[in-house]
Amino acid sequence: MIRLASEKDVKSILEIIKDAKAFLKENNVNQWQDNYPNEDTIINDINKKQLYVYEEKEVLAFIAIIESIEETYNIIYDGKWLNDDSYLTIHRIAVKKEARHCNIASKLFMYAIEYANKRNIKSIRVDTHRDNIVMQKLILKHDFKKCGYIYLKDHSPRLAYERLV
């Protein structure tokens, strides 16, 4: 079941983040290796009602689905976005270590696509680190197109993708 996250989920989500950081580090991906995302990030997402959890008896995964404009997407390099209309942004997706390879991340992506459809939002955007091959495969599996790259606020480059809905 996918539902909005609540404050009672914070501990479980932070454990999933810890797992994800270790996985990324083991795979030489310099993403989430600082103090991000952290408890404040998660609580902010919960308060804004933009964090969702996948639950089967316990929280196994989470995803942030954001309807507001993503500042770092205002300028895209070596390409262009597919759509200039409204869009959703997918951020902060991770699956509990024991639940990897159970297609849960795909279910969360499909949920985001359905979410956009129901709200008549024209597209979904997502970005990831160039070394995060697992995430790139997930993004492409769901028919996102690589549009170029963007820079985060800390000036780190990210591959930028979009899917028309």
Which role does the model predict for each range below?
Residues V95, H101-E114, K137-K141:
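Conserved acetyl-CoA-binding loop-helix of GNAT-fold acetyltransferases
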Residues K49-A64:
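Conserved beta-hairpin
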Residues R100, V126-M135:
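Conserved beta-strand-loop-alpha-helix junction that forms the acyl-donor binding cleft
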Residues M1-E15:
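A short beta-loop-alpha structural element at the N-terminal edge
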Residues F109, A116-T128:
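Conserved GNAT acetyl-CoA-binding A-motif
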Residues K21-T41:
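Conserved GNAT-fold acetyl-CoA-binding loop/helix
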Residues D127-T128, L140-L159:
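Conserved catalytic-core motifs of GNAT/GCN5-like acyltransferases
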Residues A64-A94, R100:
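Conserved acyl-donor/pantetheine-binding loop and adjacent beta-alpha core of acyl/acetyltransferases
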